[in-house]
């Protein structure tokens, strides 16, 4: 490990709903002794309502996530330790909010308002040192979502996941905020298979050691 060059790195894991971000964040934080910053799903006051009525609650939910993620990024920036973040502020702004707008689930004035808030925040935000993208097919996502059995996710539609996946691929293809590591998760099981996790860790080591 050549961590001595930079003690306070910022790594982030991106990917669609059910791609395994939270699981990998936990495993990597345990392995490297990094601080994990999770997505705020437990305390989020809008999530249940959003999945019942997306149109009504889309703006509220997205602003909540944006605020929560911005706070995380500021905390990471001011920290002298290495952090690994479960999803980035860019996914909120470039994938989830535009998708809701395109699907007619967020009005244009709300979307424009949202974009203005993000653009302001973006001036204070730097991309992570390394972004790890978990690429998964829709069938893998559905399988994972069903396996973890979060009640509010039962109503997620296939076309919603498909559109998100398309937006993820478009975003990743143009990503330029820092180093990028893409991991195809369809044929691996890092949550239960130590060898699969070990392979991911090797790739991350190579990226980190080449960073500085």
Q: Where are the language model's segments positioned?
A:
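A glycine- and Lys/Arg-enriched "phosphate-lid" helix/loop adjacent to the NTP-binding pocket
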Residues: 95-169
